[in-house]
From Swiss-Prot:
Family classification: Belongs to the peptidase T1B family. HslV subfamily.
Entry superkingdom: Bacteria
Subunit structure: A double ring-shaped homohexamer of HslV is capped on each side by a ring-shaped HslU homohexamer. The assembly of the HslU/HslV complex is dependent on binding of ATP.
A GO CC term assigned to this protein in UniProt: proteasome core complex
Function: Protease subunit of a proteasome-like degradation complex believed to be a general protein degrading machinery.
UniProt keywords, alphabetically: Allosteric enzyme, Cytoplasm, Hydrolase, Metal-binding, Protease, Sodium, Threonine protease
Protein EC: 3.4.25.2
Active site: T7
Protein name as it appears in the record: ATP-dependent protease subunit HslV
Broad class of where this protein is predominantly found: cytoplasm
Length: 178
């Protein structure tokens, strides 16, 4: 069976602002199945941003579990992420899920992987997905050499990734927190 490919998710934090954005392309083999998928969401009463890459069904399953962990830990992003990663790593069914998440609240940005990793990215920039390396490189260059707002850095980084990665389009959803 062919694998779904695609997605670029990038987050930039500067000062008291954080932006998280993603493209809208879902690809099956060499066919674009959808160009307007929404892979970035606000959860926990709009206080937490989350973006996902990987298998869509797996990502939604993890998103539901992550929301439950946020409720359990009263919005403590780090505790919720670590608990989700522990479950993801130790549960046989969850271990098969193929997705990654970037989560952000007013204070913290974390990357959560299926390997049980919870990573606090250096420099306030994180990116995942097929175009993640392009977006992260562009975001890093822009953040270090301009005074652009995080939302603008995310938009430009996604644009560059969309120009270089065949699994990334230029239909973006970008959310911000201040």
């Amino acid at each position: 069976m062919e694998q779904y490919h695609g997605t670029t998710i990038v987050s930039v934090r500067r000062g008291n602002q954080v932006a998280l954005g993603g493209d809208g392309q879902v690809t099956l083999g060499n066919i674009v199945m959808k160009g307007t998928a929404r892979k970035v969401r606000r959860i926990y009463n709009g206080k937490v941003l989350v973006g996902f890459a990987g298998s869509t069904a797996d990502a939604f399953s993890l998103l539901d579990r992550f929301e439950a962990k946020l409720e359990k830990y009263q919005g403590n992003l780090t505790r919720a992420a670590v608990d989700l990663a522990k479950d993801w790593r130790s549960d046989r069914a969850l271990r098969r899920l193929e997705a990654m998440l970037i989560t952000a609240d007013r204070d913290t940005t974390l990357v959560i992987t299926g390997n049980g990793d919870v990573l606090d990215p250096e420099g306030g920039i994180a990116a995942i997905g097929s175009g993640g390396a392009y977006a992260q490189s562009a975001a890093k260059a822009l953040a270090e050499n301009t005074e652009m707002a995080p939302k603008d850095v995310v938009e430009k980084a996604l644009t560059i990734a969309g120009e270089l990665c065949i699994y990334t389009n230029t239909n973006f959803v970008i959310e911000t927190l201040e």
